[in-house]
C-alpha cells in the first residue's frame, strides 16, 4: 500500500518570533492571525487567558481553532491558561514566558493588524539595536499616520503598544514589585520629568495603584522603564498597524467609533502602510520632540482646552444618538475622579 503523500510546508519568511495574546474573540483574532500567516514568522508564541466561566468557553475554543492553522514551517509554543487572571497580570506573564524562550519578539494582541512589512521592519530593528540599551521598544503604530522625516523611522519617548517589539533585556529589567517607588530621589526626579515634559501625570498615580493591587501591569512597567532609564522607542515614519479595539466588547474601548471624537476616531481608521526596503536609517539617535508634542495634542495631554473640546464633542455625539446611560456613566466617573475615588486598575 503506497504511503500517504507528504506535502512540504513552505518555509518561514522572516526569522523572527511573534507572541500573540488572545482570549475569547475569534473574529478580530482571525484578522490578526491572517496577517501573521501571510508573514510566516519562524517562531510563534500563543498565550490565552483562562475562562471566567461557562460563557467564555465557546469563544475560547473558537480562538484556539483560529490559531491552529499554522501552514508553514514554524516553531510553535502554546500557553493556554485554565484559570482566568485578567488582562493584568496576563500580559506580563505572557511576555515573561515568551522571553524565557526567545531573546527578541514581536507582541500582538487580538485587535492589532500589522502590515506585511511590519515583520521584516521589526526583525531589522531588533537585530540592529539589540545591544543599544538606549532603545527600549520598536513600535508599529504611528498615531500621526505619517511623519515628516527623511528616514524610514525615528525615535521618541512616547509609548505605543498597538503592535510592538522588544528584547529580553527589557522585559527582564521590569520590576513587578515597583520597588523604585520606595526611592524618594527617583520619585522626585520622575515627578520633575513628568511636570517638565507634560508626560501623562496620571501614570505616577497608576504605578502606585498598580503596586497596591499586588499585580504586575506591563503598561506601567514599560512606561516606568522608558522614564527611569531615559529610554527611547523606534517609530516608523508611516503607520504600520490598524487597531480594531474601538468596538463594543473590547477590553479598553467600549464605545463605538460613531461616538468617539473625530481626532481619536482617526487613530482607529487610519490604514497600515508598507515600507520599502532597504530601509533608510537615521545616522543618529535623538528624540524627535515635535512628534511627541503632536502626540500630546492628539491625546490632549497638557492641552486642557483640547480636552474640554473633545469632551463636549463626545457629549454631543452621545446626545444625538440618545445614549443617555453612557453619558450618565461618564458623568459619574468624572465626579468620582474629582473626588479622588478613581483607581488606575
Segments and roles (model prediction):
Residues 2-108, 112-345:
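Peripheral/terminal regions associated with large enzymatic or DNA-binding modules
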Amino acid at each position: 500500500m503506497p504511503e500517504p503523500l507528504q506535502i512540504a510546508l513552505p518555509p518561514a519568511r522572516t526569522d523572527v518570533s511573534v507572541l500573540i495574546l488572545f482570549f475569547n474573540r475569534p473574529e478580530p483574532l482571525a484578522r490578526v492571525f491572517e496577517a501573521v500567516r501571510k508573514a510566516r514568522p519562524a517562531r510563534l508564541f500563543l498565550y490565552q487567558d483562562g475562562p471566567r466561566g461557562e460563557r467564555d468557553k465557546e469563544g475560547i475554543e473558537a480562538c484556539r481553532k483560529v490559531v491552529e492553522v499554522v501552514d508553514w514551517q514554524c516553531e510553535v509554543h502554546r500557553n493556554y491558561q485554565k484559570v482566568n487572571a485578567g488582562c493584568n497580570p496576563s500580559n506580563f506573564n505572557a511576555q515573561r514566558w515568551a522571553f524565557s524562550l526567545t531573546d527578541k519578539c514581536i507582541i500582538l494582541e487580538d485587535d492589532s493588524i500589522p502590515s506585511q512589512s511590519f515583520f521584516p521592519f521589526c526583525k531589522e530593528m531588533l537585530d540592529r539595536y539589540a545591544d543599544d540599551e538606549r532603545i527600549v521598544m520598536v513600535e508599529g503604530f504611528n498615531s500621526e499616520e505619517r511623519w515628516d522625516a527623511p528616514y524610514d523611522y525615528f525615535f521618541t519617548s512616547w509609548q505605543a503598544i498597538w503592535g510592538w517589539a522588544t528584547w529580553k533585556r527589557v522585559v527582564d529589567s521590569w520590576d513587578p514589585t515597583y520597588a523604585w517607588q520606595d526611592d524618594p530621589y527617583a520619585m522626585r526626579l520622575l515627578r520633575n520629568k513628568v511636570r517638565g515634559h507634560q508626560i501623562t501625570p496620571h501614570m505616577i498615580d497608576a504605578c502606585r495603584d498598580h503596586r497596591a493591587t499586588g499585580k504586575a501591569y506591563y503598561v506601567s512597567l514599560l512606561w516606568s522603564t522608558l522614564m527611569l532609564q531615559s529610554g527611547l522607542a523606534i517609530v516608523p515614519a508611516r503607520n504600520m498597524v490598524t487597531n480594531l479595539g474601538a468596538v463594543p466588547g473590547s477590553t479598553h474601548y467600549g464605545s463605538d467609533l460613531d461616538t468617539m471624537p473625530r481626532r481619536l476616531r482617526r487613530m482607529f481608521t487610519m490604514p497600515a502602510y508598507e515600507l520599502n526596503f532597504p530601509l533608510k536609517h537615521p545616522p543618529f539617535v535623538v528624540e524627535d520632540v515635535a512628534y511627541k508634542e503632536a502626540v500630546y495634542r492628539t491625546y490632549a495631554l497638557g492641552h486642557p482646552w483640547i480636552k474640554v473640546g473633545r469632551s463636549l464633542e463626545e457629549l454631543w455625539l452621545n446626545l444625538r444618538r440618545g445614549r443617555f446611560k453612557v453619558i450618565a456613566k461618564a458623568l459619574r466617573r468624572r465626579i468620582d475622579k474629582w473626588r479622588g475615588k478613581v483607581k488606575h486598575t
